[in-house]
Amino acid sequence: GMVDTLMLSSVSDQAVGAVGTANTYIGVFIIMFGVISSGMVAVMSQNIGAGKPGIAYQARQLGLVFNALTGILISVVLAVFSGGILRAVSIAPALLESAETYLKIVGGASFLNALIPIFSSYLRVFGYTKHSLIGTVVGNVINIILNSVFLFVFNWGVMGVAAATVFSKVVNLIIVAAMGAVLIKAKQSPERAQPRKILAQIVKIGFPSAFETALYNVAMTFIVCFMNHMDTDGMNVTARSYAMQIANFSYCVGAALAQANAIMTGWRIGAKKYEECDRGTRKAVIYGLVTATCFSVTFAMTGRFIVQDRKSTRLNSSHL
């Protein structure tokens, strides 16, 4: 998202606003993926800590099937009804065409957003965190290259950025899926449990976490809807898009620490090392708070250098 925002900012601020708006509504629709993904990580890590990698593999398979089916359904909905969704939330007329193009292409491939976390989490819970990172880095590098070609050579604008995003996600998915198949041999472990029992555990753990995310995304949806009514050129939504992408850097620090701590906590719970869970979580909170604060202060002071339009610059600085 940050790459797309920075590269589109050289084309027009309205393109940034259109993509930011489309991504907001894509985020609302893919909340259901989080129910399985977050619950699956907890179940897998606990069983790995308990010495039952075979059950962890079962949890991965269940998560894969559920998210694949849900992802295909959501992809069809977003591809077919993208224009209707944007008109229903009264998107600024100046942003409608670009936002619809992006939502149709990237939203139509949202099943990739459902599958990538399954395979990436599978690598992480077994300790292959660097390998998961490789897939992400390669995908981002390809995204940057294709964005450059589509934007500055073919002049495809938002459509080019959307196509580059989808292709980079396909590459990311192939890499993490292949690495998981080669590096992890949990399938060969004899431990097995009732699939219904495992799925119940996944949903029980994942639903509260996904519901928390859902409330946040719904709030963001209403905010974007209100901002769309504030002007006809979409400048307020554009400023928000810049601010959110910049602020995501500090968010990523907390998210990374949270993911690492969740996996390690699962290992310790499985191994019945409960006191270590508390100590590890306290350390993660302190590290995350200090680092995120440093990022937040830095971006609040430097955010005005990214935006071209003066009005958008003032709005962006106030958002940050």
What do these predicted regions represent?
Residues 2-17, 86-93, 149-156, 214-245, ...:
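Helix-terminus/linker motif at the lipid-water interface of multi-pass membrane proteins
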Residues 16-76, 113-132, 224, 237-303:
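Small-residue-rich hydrophobic transmembrane alpha-helices
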Residues 20-23, 67, 103-106, 110, ...:
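Residue-level recognition of transmembrane alpha-helices
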Residues 27, 67, 106, 132, ...:
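Residue-level signature of transmembrane alpha-helical cores of multipass secondary-active transporters
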Residues 73-104, 294-314:
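Short membrane-interface helical motifs at transmembrane helix boundaries
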Residues 130, 140-173, 303-308:
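Membrane-interface helix-loop junctions in multi-pass transport and translocation proteins
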Residues 165, 174-216:
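Interhelical loop/hinge segments that connect adjacent transmembrane helices in multipass membrane
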Residues 315-320:
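Single conserved hydrophobic/aromatic residue that forms the stacking wall/gate
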